[in-house]
A protein has these predicted regions:
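Glycine-rich, N-terminal phosphate-binding loop of Rossmann-like dinucleotide-binding domains
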Residues: 36-37, 62, 104
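Single conserved hydrophobic/aromatic residue that forms the stacking wall/gate
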Residues: 1-8, 13
């Protein structure tokens, strides 16, 4: 049975409801659902649409609908305007309340938030290597002992997500086409590596710019960036979205992964590069900002903007 994994609701655990079979009953009892299930992609797509069509908004951690044209993929500080596509989605689904919104993959949370405020300098080409914690695979060292003292240079599907999903975040809502049109730049190439760390995804990032910013301009842009969640003072929003660390040995997982209760992004080691223009290191908490916390913040944004309402 998939009970609490879908809705995280005490009543579903108590009543032993099955999240894949009792859709209409669950949808009638809750204001919205979070979805994070281990199923085939086409099954997840169908399940999330069933909840939406049952007039129950869905905030999804799954990748199934991340490229559905009228489903917003939201990183709340970066592209909150994408939720404006929801009325078009509701029209397609034939719903009044129901819709689907998704959050992006955990792998990109350590570098896309840092690149976003730098886009005013014309981000052109990006090379990134991510070093991803084992909790991203739902594992601990106890049940994945082969990861102790080991590195695996492959994580299935992560590199494609890490290259394509940022372009959708950088995209725009096309009112005429009634869809989100992905951006065509920057060009991103990525390698994703599994490392023996429990929590925290680190990214080594190399960037070419159309303009020629100074180090001071880049750091100022990072430190001063804030988004709608900060303006609205949403409960889960970090006060300072991005922190820049001056020390040469930061950010570190052991010292910085829980910055702003795991909802903030840590950046450091910004310096000029001999092949690209600039390089830096980013760090995010993959199971907080990159998963559950990011979904909660997305739901808070949707409630604040009137898309999730109490029945």
């Amino acid at each position: 049975e998939m009970t609490s994994s879908l809705v995280g609701s005490e009543m579903c655990i108590r009543d032993r409801m099955n999240a894949t079979e009792d859709v209409e009953k669950i949808a009638s009892m809750v204001d919205f659902v979070f979805c994070a299930v281990d199923m085939k992609k086409d099954e997840i797509k169908a399940l999330e649409e069933r909840y939406a069509k049952a007039e129950c908004p869905v905030v999804s951690n799954n990748s199934a609908h991340r490229h559905t044209p009228d489903v917003p993929m939201v990183l709340p500080e970066l592209n909150p305007e994408h939720i404006e596509i929801i009325p078009s989605q509701r029209k397609r689904l034939g719903t009044k309340r129901g819709f689907i919104a998704v959050k992006p993959n955990c792998s990109l949370q350590g570098y896309v938030p840092a690149l976003f405020p730098l886009s005013k300098f014309g981000v052109k080409d990006v090379l990134v290597c991510t070093y991803q914690a084992i909790s991203g695979a739902g594992k601990t060292f106890k049940d994945w002992p082969e990861m102790v003292g080991n590195i695996i240079p492959y994580i299935g599907g992560e590199e494609e997500k890490s290259e394509k999903e940022p372009l959708r975040i950088w995209g725009h809502v096309d009112d005429e086409k009634k869809e989100i049109v992905p951006a065509t730049s920057p060009v991103i190439t990525c390698q994703c590596i599994r490392v023996p760390v429990l929590n925290g995804h680190t990214a080594a990032v190399f960037v070419k710019f159309k303009k020629n910013p100074t180090k001071e301009q880049l750091i100022e842009a990072l430190k001063n960036y804030s988004g709608v969640p900060q303006e609205l003072n949403l409960p889960s929003a970090p006060k300072q979205f991005i922190q820049y660390l001056e020390e040469d040995n930061r950010p570190q997982v052991s010292m910085d992964v829980n910055y702003e209760n795991g909802m903030g992004i840590s950046v450091g080691r910004l310096r000029e590069d001999t092949v690209y223009d600039w390089k830096f290191v980013g760090l995010s908490h993959n199971t907080v900002r990159g998963a559950a916390g990011g979904a909660v913040l997305c739901a808070e944004l949707l409630k604040a903007q009137g898309y999730i309402t109490k029945k």
